[in-house]
UniProtKB/Swiss-Prot annotation:
GO CC annotations, alphabetized: cytoplasm; mating projection; plasma membrane
BP term (GO), one: cell morphogenesis involved in conjugation with cellular fusion
Phosphoserine: residues carrying this PTM: S41, S303, S363, S491, S561, S671, S857, S1005, S1034
Biased composition (Acidic residues): 605-619, 1006-1019
Role noted for this protein: Polarity-determining protein which forms a conjugate with the ubiquitin-like modifier HUB1. Involved in bud site selection and cellular morphogenesis during conjugation. Required for survival during stationary phase.
Assembly and interaction partners: Conjugated with HUB1. HUB1 has not the classical C-terminal Gly residue, so it is still unknown how conjugation may occur.
Localisation: Cytoplasm
Species the sequence originates in: Saccharomyces cerevisiae (strain ATCC 204508 / S288c) (Baker's yeast)
Name of the molecule in the record: Protein HBT1
Keyword entries, A-Z: Cell shape, Conjugation, Cytoplasm, Phosphoprotein
Biased composition (Basic residues): 964-976
Region Disordered, residue ranges: 1-455, 469-894, 908-1046
Length: 1046
């Protein structure tokens, strides 16, 4: 996959390069049968891919990869024969020639750099070169040591902004131009020529030449530089500056590399990087022959430039072959990685040491080894960064194909194109740049973002479905694959892929933007740098979008964050572009960040969408497609980003409202649903209930928040279950401070809201990395925390704690969404209200008594209790519990199911807040389960919870414990059927006295809960599951998360 990704990506770069590799010779690239064919195939695939990834995220990616393989591998092989390493595929189009030409690559690379790819490669090359200081030192040393190097570096590093601004004419080019002209032209140009990279330094020629890659090959170095200088190159340079600065190797590589700016541009520009790695690396590889590199620059530049239209391979293979085979090979890995995935480019930048070192390794290996080694190395490099790999793969699907589509549709892409997108689509972007850099880039961004969004959604679902290892603890993981929270939960690990899925596009774009910081970077430095941080401070989601875009998008290279800033600045400049690209970019970075801050971006965004509407996921895709999320989510427009990312992506919620609400956690309804829940709760709101209701409302906000952390439905349940401010606070913390998610997870566990933590953790676990932490915490606290902590969280009420246990059982049933367990769920959700029905009890025949039923439901509810009850309980119940547990396990795996059950358990209250799940669930419920004989034993179990309600708070969940509770449960159960939310809280209202509070409700609802469980059992079996589904849905405020969880 990595190699394929590389190939695919390379193919993308190649295609792009073929299409746009040289402003001067786009036709010749198109004429490349491989690139043209690939172009066709990719362009045909791209539009489909936009839509396809949703349906077949994996298969589409693989199809694209296969296409890329089929198209690129043969071509690569052919060119590998030309001593173009497979990595040259991307390079091969743009970079390969540049990279292959490696030091000629300045021209070749520049030519390609002229197209984004070269710049990107150059960056890689630079990183690589830097990394390959030994080989690179030869030339880099020259570059570095040489005045030109110093000068170039000086320019790049010293005045990246000036560079940008100077070159300002083309935005990206402006940077390169300023830098090149200033450094390259004046001081570096001569030295630059001396240097292989100096040629790049010769930005005077290069600058003009760079964009017109074909243009002045006379100063091959200049040409190369020119490419670097050229928009993408310039952008790359700017970014390269950032990268160079950030990545000393990059800087060094840039300076040293014939493309000081170009290299820088490459570093910045993924396009440039792609080529530049070849160039730089070629330099590195050729660095041994510094003169050779230079010669390559000149010779290859001229030859390659001429050849480039014909084919990168010819360029690479031929002119560069003597030195370039290794250079190519060296560049290959880099280029491949670089072009293969822009993420890698960032990696190269960020991981200049590691990635560069790897490349260095490859530089040495590749330099000496055959191009095939490059493929291996590329594969290794790709493998080196899983996220990078994903980036490659995703980029292929999202970015590469999108770019190819751009190649096919320069105008539409142009419309979307953003200067920032250059880095994302270095190959095609640079080409696009040549064709119509801004517009095309914009189009590319949009297409990529849309396609990335679609692909992201598909892959996200894919990942979410297979993200149980991320969701490890929750059954919800799979069921929640619909849920943004789960996705984000997965995003910690899986969503890295998702991030990478988008990252390549947005990353390329970002790097391009950052690299072509001339437009973006100046603003990026001022606006983007702080904008990103502003986003960070302003909104975690935005921060994720911004900082994470930089860091996360630079999943491979955190160094890219400055670049990202610049790019974002560029994106900011191009609202459309940024918005278009950002959704994938944000997603990618958020996904990547999800490992650290899963909620920062993706969680809020996805969860909001998914929390509130089953179609919200589609909304998310649509938002992405519609650039709702991408536009606003992207940092291009921080305010819009916050607003739409949260508002439009959620669909129902305003992102700002969501974020603020999440932070407030209960200040105002996050969404209509939250409002609805709130209204329902408020109906029965009393002091405690008010809090509880508030918590639930907050929980709905937590739906958004929990979306981040725990997904709306679960948060709703969680809130219902916890119905406690601590839980809400935790959710608020998690959501309000996405950055603090990890902290919050511990906090939740530490908060003493163990149950909140546990429940939330269970949900969290389902929904986000914070949930993971929570679920871990919950797992830790699960038994006791769920019961006691949960109780303690909301109400120090032991009843609440007991309710929590019942809740766990009920929730477990819900979670299991098993008809058998739906019993418990239904009992909790529907039957619970109907619990008073003796017939239900009888029909459940759990003991003919609600206590027996409750006992059964209780045991089902509490995982821990289940264990105890299994021992204590009759084999039939044990079997049922085992069944439920098994279902739970099947849903989320043993760990997830146990954690989920322990944390959330089968929370009837989640289904039906009225259910005394809160007070009901108790670790002691084993005894309560044990005393199937009567409510009293359950009361014993409820002793903690029932301490308050020794009366009817019998073991029976909702049957006899509190008659009004029981009746209310029936009443509420019906209400819940009609309006789950209103019923839930009305239920609390019904139990308006002490039971009015959610906790009391739980008490009163304990019996009702038992009946509810019984009812659920019977009803579930009798087809009441649908009602429970309705209840869950209504409780979750229409959130499908309940079902998904179940």
């Amino acid at each position: 996959m990595n190699m394929n990704e590389s190939i695919s990506k390379d193919g993308q770069g190649e295609e792009e390069q073929n299409n746009f590799s040289f402003g001067g010779k786009p036709g010749s690239y198109d004429s490349n049968s491989d690139s043209a064919q690939r172009k066709k195939s990719f362009s045909t695939t791209k539009p489909t891919e936009y839509n396809l990834p949703k349906e077949q995220p994996e298969s589409t990616s693989k199809n694209l990869e296969t296409k890329a393989k089929n198209i690129l591998l043969p071509w690569r092989k052919k060119h590998n024969k030309d001593s173009e390493t497979p990595h040259e595929d991307t390079e091969a189009d743009a970079n390969r020639r540049a990279n292959v030409t490696s030091d000629v690559n300045p021209v070749s690379a520049d030519t390609k750099s002229s197209s984004g790819p070269n710049a990107t490669i150059t960056t890689h090359g630079y990183s690589y070169v830097k990394t390959t200081t030994p080989a690179a030192t030869s030339e880099q040393s020259k570059v570095k040591t040489s005045p030109p190097t110093s000068h170039e570096h000086s320019n790049i590093k010293a005045s990246p902004t000036a560079h940008r601004h100077s070159k300002g004419d083309a935005g990206h080019p402006s940077i390169a131009t300023t830098h090149n002209h200033s450094t390259s032209k004046a001081a570096t140009s001569p030295v630059t020529h001396t240097h292989g990279h100096s040629s790049a330094t010769t930005s005077p020629v290069t600058h003009t030449h760079g964009h017109a890659s074909v243009k002045t090959t006379s100063p091959t170095n200049t040409h190369e530089h020119s490419k670097a200088n050229t928009g993408p190159s310039a952008t790359a340079t700017t970014h390269g500056h950032i990268n160079v600065k950030t990545t000393h190797p990059v800087s060094h590589g840039h300076s040293g590399s014939s493309t000081g700016p170009k290299s820088t541009a490459a570093a910045q520009d993924h396009s440039s990087t792609k080529t530049n790695p070849s160039v730089t690396h070629g330099h590195t590889s050729v660095k041994d022959n510094s003169s050779a590199t230079k010669g390559y620059s000149n010779t290859d530049s001229n030859s390659d430039r001429d050849v480039i239209p014909g084919s990168f391979r010819g360029m690479t293979g031929t002119d560069v072959n003597p030195v370039d085979p290794s250079v190519y090979t060296s560049t290959g890995p880099k280029s491949n990685v670089s072009s293969g995935m822009n993420a890698v480019d960032p990696s190269v930048y960020t991981d200049t040491s590691s990635k560069s070192a790897d490349r260095r390794k490859y530089s040495g290996n590749t330099a000496t080894g055959p191009p095939q080694d490059t493929i291996k190395e590329i594969a290794q490099n790709v493998k080196m960064d899983e996220s990078e790999q994903t980036g490659l793969k995703n980029d292929q699907v999202s970015g590469s194909d999108a770019i190819q589509q751009q190649t096919m549709e320069p105008e539409p892409k142009a419309a979307v194109g953003t200067s920032g997108f250059v880095s994302q689509q270095p190959s095609y972007h640079d080409s696009n740049k040549n064709i119509q850099h801004p517009e095309k880039n914009k189009v590319d961004n949009k297409n990529i973002s849309e396609r990335a969004a679609e692909k992201f959604n598909i892959e996200r679902d894919d990942i979410l479905e297979s993200a149980d290892d991320y969701q490890q603890k929750n059954i919800k993981s799979k069921t929640d694959s619909n849920w943004g929270p789960i996705e984000y939960s997965s995003s910690a690990g899986k969503n890295k892929n998702l991030q990478d899925v988008v990252i390549p596009s947005s990353m390329k774009e970002k790097f391009d933007s950052g690299t072509s910081g001339s437009q973006n970077m100046p603003k990026a430095g001022t606006e983007l740098g702080h904008m990103k941080y502003n986003d960070n401070g302003r909104d975690n989601l935005q921060y994720v979008a911004g900082s994470q875009a930089g860091s996360q998008n630079t999943n491979n290279n955190i160094d890219m964050s400055p670049r990202h800033e610049a790019e974002w600045s560029g994106l900011s400049n191009d609202a459309t572009t940024r918005n278009n690209v950002v959704s994938p970019a944000m997603k990618d970075e958020d996904m990547n960040e999800d490992s650290t801050k899963p909620h920062q971006y993706g969680l809020d965004y996805l969860d909001d969408v998914e929390d509130y509407h089953e179609n919200d996921i589609d909304d998310y895709s649509n938002a992405k497609k519609n650039d709702l999320y991408s536009k606003k989510a992207y940092q291009g427009k921080p305010s819009d980003y916050n607003y739409e990312q949260r508002e439009k992506i959620p669909g129902t919620f305003e992102p700002d409202t969501l974020s603020k609400s999440v932070q407030k956690q209960d200040e105002d309804p996050l969404s209509p649903r939250q409002t609805t829940n709130r209204a329902g709760m408020e109906t029965a709101r009393d002091e405690s209930l008010g809090n509880y209701e508030y918590s639930n409302t907050s929980g709905n906000k937590k739906l958004s928040d929990l979306s981040k952390n725990k997904s709306g439905p679960t948060p709703t349940r969680s809130n219902f279950i916890d119905q406690i401010e601590p839980r809400r606070a935790k959710t608020t913390q998690d959501i309000a401070s996405d950055a603090k998610d990890f902290t919050n997870n511990p906090e939740t566990g530490t908060t003493g809201n163990v149950d909140t933590t546990g429940r939330m953790g269970a949900k969290s676990k389902t929904f986000s990395s914070n949930p993971f932490d929570d679920s871990k915490n919950t797992d830790t606290h699960l038994e006791n925390a769920n019961v006691a902590a949960f109780d303690n969280s909301r109400s120090g009420d032991t009843t609440y704690s007991k309710s929590g246990d019942a809740e766990t059982a009920a929730y477990d049933n819900i979670k299991n969404a098993d008809p058998t367990y739906a019993k418990s769920q239904d009992i909790t959700g529907m039957t619970h209200d109907q619990e008073p029905s003796s017939e239900q009890k009888a029909s459940y025949g759990s003991g003919g008594n609600s206590q027996n039923q409750e006992y059964s439901s209780d045991d089902n509810i509490d995982v821990n209790k289940n264990a105890k009850v299994l021992e204590e309980d009759a084999p039939g119940y044990k079997r049922e519990v085992d069944l439920k547990n098994k279902r739970r396990t099947d849903l989320g795996g043993a760990d997830a199911s146990n954690a989920y059950a322990a944390e959330v358990g089968n929370f009837p209250s989640l289904i039906d807040p009225h259910v005394p799940t809160y007070g009901f669930k108790d670790t002691n419920t084993s005894s309560s389960q044990k005393p199937s004989e009567g409510t009293y034993p359950e009361t014993t179990s409820y002793s903690i919870h029932n301490e308050t309600t020794s009366q009817g708070r019998k073991v029976s969940v909702g049957s006899m414990g509190s008659g009004k509770s029981k009746h209310h449960h029936n009443h509420h159960r019906h209400s819940r059927q009609n309006s789950s939310k209103g019923s839930d809280y009305d239920y609390n209202n019904s139990t308006h006295s002490a039971e009015h509070t959610p906790r009391h409700h739980q008490y009163g609802s304990d019996e009702g809960e038992q009946d509810y469980h019984d009812d659920e059992q019977g009803e579930e079996q009798a087809g009441k599951q649908s009602f429970m589904g309705r209840v869950r849905k209504s409780i979750s405020g229409g959130t499908f998360g309940f079902r998904s969880e179940i």
